[in-house]
Amino acid sequence: MLFHVKMTVKLPVDMDPQQAERLKAEEKEMAQRLQREGSWRHLWRIAGHYANYSLFDLPSVEALHDTLTRLPLFPYMDIEIDGLCRHPSSIHADDR
């Protein structure tokens, strides 16, 4: 299943800077691993915001939930999710 996910990060203004940097490094490592594994298919930064649009390819809503809740920055995110399905006019073979 494909999911379009908008993640907006809202770190507390009083968070220890070292903790924030550690969380960001852990998040980057996990995001890159999930991309290499193929479950996090695309990742785009939203210009001017501490936010991203992502495309996840996972077997179920539960798998998406499990993946998102394991992200180190999850406690500091506002997340919006849209499930996607193949459009009948699409010419791309890798749509699912």
Swiss-Prot record:
Known pathway: Aromatic compound metabolism; beta-ketoadipate pathway; 5-oxo-4,5-dihydro-2-furylacetate from catechol: step 3/3
Class of enzymatic activity (EC top level): isomerase
Disulphide bond pairs: none
Known EC number: 5.3.3.4
Keywords: Aromatic hydrocarbons catabolism, Isomerase
GO MF term set: muconolactone delta-isomerase activity
One Gene Ontology biological process: beta-ketoadipate pathway
A Pfam family assignment: MIase
Catalytic activity: (S)-muconolactone = (4,5-dihydro-5-oxofuran-2-yl)-acetate
Family: Belongs to the muconolactone Delta-isomerase family.
NCBIfam families the record matches: muco_delta
Subunit structure: Homodecamer.
This protein's name: Muconolactone Delta-isomerase
